[in-house]
């Protein structure tokens, strides 16, 4: 299987997101890379599912709460930005204060 660099990055984000989802489901508090991976992978999947940038910006701030992550993590992630492929092209999704 031959993947471009971008495809490899997407695959790594998806894998890290799946691991973070499993840890969250087991009741573990997520660290910074896990929290970013979970939100980023959900944003990419939402774009693939046909959601709009606006919908994803709003939803992205609801997936994790302060109770889901280790102490100090919300302050470490003031914003998440990811380029996602939508049916009409690639767009930048920005989620401000993603962990509330």
Swiss-Prot record:
It catalyses: urea + 2 H2O + H(+) = hydrogencarbonate + 2 NH4(+). Belongs to the urease gamma subunit family. Pathway: Nitrogen metabolism; urea degradation; CO(2) and NH(3) from urea (urease route): step 1/1. This is Urease subunit gamma. One of its GO terms (cellular component) is cytoplasm. The keyword Nucleus does not apply. Heterotrimer of UreA (gamma), UreB (beta) and UreC (alpha) subunits. Three heterotrimers associate to form the active enzyme. Keywords: Cytoplasm, Hydrolase. It holds the Pfam family Urease_gamma. GO terms for molecular function: nickel cation binding; urease activity.
